[in-house]
Amino acid sequence: MVKVVWTDLALADLKSIHEYISKDSKFYADRYVDKLIKRVDQLENYPQSGRMVPEFSKEYIRELIEGSYRIIFIVEADRIGIIRVHHSAQQLKNI
């Protein structure tokens, strides 16, 4: 089992997602963010999950898709670094 570490940027993404959805419903904002976190938790047991991020073509930069969001992460020997939680409608530039 590997350790999953969230970057400050990824945590800020989660906060922004929560704030945006909360404008309509705090209940659904809590529920959706929990769903994203649970998806990331699966990486502890399955670190090679998801696919390579097409914009970067590097095997160690991968993504999971959850709803409209792309969870971008870096696979290292002993840990997974969650670097962004990015809406799929937005262009992914630098990470």
What are these model-predicted stretches?
Residues 66-69, 74-95:
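Enriched for short, Lys/Arg-rich terminal
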Residues 39-41, 61, 83:
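A short hydrophobic/aromatic micro-motif that marks alpha-helical segments and, especially, helix-coil
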Residues 3-57:
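Basic, Lys/Arg-enriched alpha-helical interface segments
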Residues 1-2, 95:
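Absolute protein N-terminus
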Residues 57-63:
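Short, hydrophobic/aromatic-rich segments at coil-to-beta transitions
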Residues 49-52, 60, 88-91:
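Glycine-rich, flexible loop/turn motifs
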